[in-house]
């Protein structure tokens, strides 16, 4: 009779600081994937508008950082944190499939910006825990990441002014004029 749980398949318990880092890495994978996916989607929706370039710069940084994050996670025995991307994907699909149809371009842009700021806070948390654990390599990565990402996110935030100058575009639904189409379909428009 074979058992499904043998000694080699059981993970030894982690120290609390390592468990916290593991949890943060799961969240880091989610936020970095979101920075790529949502920034790219928002940029595509905005076409040639100036905020699109700022979003694409964040997406490019996220794409470049993901490889390093994978290496850092694997070196610390956190390879399974990439599974967290699946949860993030589910929320991204919900947002793309429904929520972005219900909110304006400007609000969708701000939600994307909020996610970027959340990602920066996650990286700050990773850095603080890495410093507490004496993990200089991880702490240095986080500091460098923040030095590159912060000005990009600031640029995205500065582009909020574009929506003020273009209120018609700001008020459009994330994927077009769904309200007008719905009203037309119901014979109300």
Which residues fall in each region the model found?
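Disorder-to-helix initiation segments
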Residues: 2-28, 35, 51, 101, ...
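Preference for long, well-ordered alpha-helical segments
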Residues: 112-189
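Acidic/histidine-rich alpha-helical segments that form the ligand environment
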Residues: 24-40, 90-141
């Amino acid at each position: 009779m074979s058992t499904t749980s043998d000694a080699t398949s059981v993970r030894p318990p982690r120290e609390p600081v390592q468990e916290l880092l593991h949890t943060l890495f799961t969240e880091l994978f989610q936020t970095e994937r979101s920075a790529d996916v949502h920034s790219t989607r928002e940029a595509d929706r905005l076409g040639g508008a100036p905020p699109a370039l700022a979003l694409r710069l964040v997406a490019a940084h996220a794409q470049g950082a993901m490889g390093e994050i994978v290496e850092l996670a694997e070196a610390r025995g956190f390879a399974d944190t990439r599974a967290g991307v699946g949860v993030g994907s589910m929320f991204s699909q919900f947002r793309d499939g429904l929520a972005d149809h219900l909110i304006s371009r400007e609000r969708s842009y701000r939600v994307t910006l909020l996610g970027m700021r959340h990602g920066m806070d996650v990286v700050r948390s990773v850095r603080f825990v890495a410093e507490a654990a004496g993990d200089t390599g991880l702490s240095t990565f986080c500091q460098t990441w923040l030095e590159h990402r912060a000005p990009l996110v600031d640029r995205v935030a500065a582009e909020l002014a574009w929506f003020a100058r273009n209120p018609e575009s700001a008020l459009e639904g994330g994927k077009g004029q769904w309200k007008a189409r719905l009203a037309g379909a119901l014979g109300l428009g």
